[in-house]
Regions:
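Periplasmic-binding protein-like
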Residues: 125-134, 189-192, 225, 246-259, ...
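N-terminal helix-turn-helix DNA-binding module of bacterial transcription factors
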Residues: 1-62
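Flexible loop/turn connectors
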Residues: 238-340
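Hinge/beta->alpha junction and helix N-cap segments in small-molecule ligand-binding domains
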Residues: 77-89, 107-115, 165-175, 191-238, ...
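Alpha-helical recognition/docking segments in bacterial nutrient-uptake
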Residues: 61-178, 182, 242-244
């Protein structure tokens, strides 16, 4: 196994320099070139701290050494990690099921945080037994985590080699758009985001939206399709763009409730009314959606249940009770309120 000396030798620096860079010592002045050489050496040598780590094997688990098990979770959020109601509902399900079985979450990270090499290095050095990943990671980060963490369960991920718990995003979008068409709308805008890997045209919620349009002989118009990258400010500005097109849509499908509520706010600020001028439907049925003005029509996603099932699968894997990956798809349902 690689040591800090090996890293220093490959990067052509001292072990003290390596240590300070790994610890993000801001008082230590070092060039970006040196910093990059050190991180490249860390990656090449697959170096982590605490190489002599406490082993937690299946026998230990069966002998009730639950306290030795370290479980982590990675959230796909662009804001502060504890402010996104969708992911917090999933996380509450994860934590409840872990606590019920005597476990707890030791590490919670966001995808954005893992872009920082120091945070990624520290996470890889945590000696995690299991990990729950919410949505798809980049190939590079995912491969590094897979190399260090034996048991990984995904929630709404595209990683095919691990267990996945999800809802059918395509079908959920179809339900939302079909509801708008049933209400008489023919010109329907789309506000969504991507995983940062695939373009919007490959995103399942967009494909579900487009499928219903095609089934109803409605032509796709990319002028009223906006990729907001799950960013609230961008969502607001993109909604304004939709409202300013010459042939303004009579309805908008937003791929999350938060984006739908931002769209409603933008519509009001343009002097228009919901749903009289423009109907809006979201997706996820977060708690606050019923209290928006007007209450938001949406697609209910079993968020807490997804978290509970993912945690239950992870516990089963840690205990060595099964090995082949499986995919569990949970049902969604239309919730009609006053925004449509």
């Amino acid at each position: 196994m690689a040591t800090i000396r090996d890293v220093a030798k490959m990067a052509n620096v001292s072990t003290a320099t390596v240590s300070r860079i790994l610890n993000a010592d801001k008082t230590y002045k070092v060039t970006n070139e040196t910093r990059e050489r050190v991180w490249q050496a860390v990656k090449t040598l697959n170096y982590v701290r605490n190489q002599v780590k406490e082993s937690v094997n299946k026998v230990d688990i069966k002998n009730s050494t639950v306290s030795k098990v370290k479980i982590g979770c990675i959230l796909c959020v662009t804001r502060e990690k504890y402010t996104d109601p969708y992911f917090m509902s999933i996380l509450s399900g994860v934590e409840a099921k872990l606590i019920e079985n005597g476990y707890s979450l030791s590490v919670i990270r966001t995808i954005n945080e893992l872009q920082d090499p120091t945070i990624l290095f520290n996470t890889l050095s945590e000696s995690l037994t299991g990990l729950i990943v919410m949505e798809t990671l980049s190939d590079e980060i995912y491969s590094q985590l897979k190399d260090k963490v034996e048991f990984i369960v995904g929630i709404d991920t595209k990683h095919q080699d691990i267990d996945n718990v999800c809802y059918d995003q395509f079908a959920a979008a179809e339900k939302a758009v079909q509801h708008l068409i049933d209400k008489g709308h023919r010109r329907i805008g789309f506000i969504g985001g991507t995983d940062g890997i695939d373009p919007i045209r490959k995103e399942q919620r967009y494909r579900g939206y487009l499928s219903v349009l095609e089934d109803n002989n409605i032509k796709e118009d990319f002028d009223i399709v906006k990729n907001c990258e799950w960013d609230s400010k961008m969502c607001y500005s993109k909604t304004i763009e939709i409202l300013n097109v010459q042939d303004r849509p009579t309805a908008i499908f937003a791929a999350s409730d938060l984006m739908a509520m931002i769209a409603v706010n933008a519509i009001y600020e343009q002097g228009l009314k919901v749903p009289d001028d423009i109907a809006v439907i979201g997706l996820s049925n977060i708690d606050m959606s019923k209290y928006s003005n007007p209450p938001l029509s949406t697609i209910d996603v079993p968020k807490t249940q997804m978290g509970e099932i993912a945690a239950e699968i992870l516990i089963t894997l840690i205990k060595g009770e099964r090995s082949l990956p499986k995919k569990i798809i949970l049902p969604t349902s239309l919730v009609v309120r006053n925004s449509t």
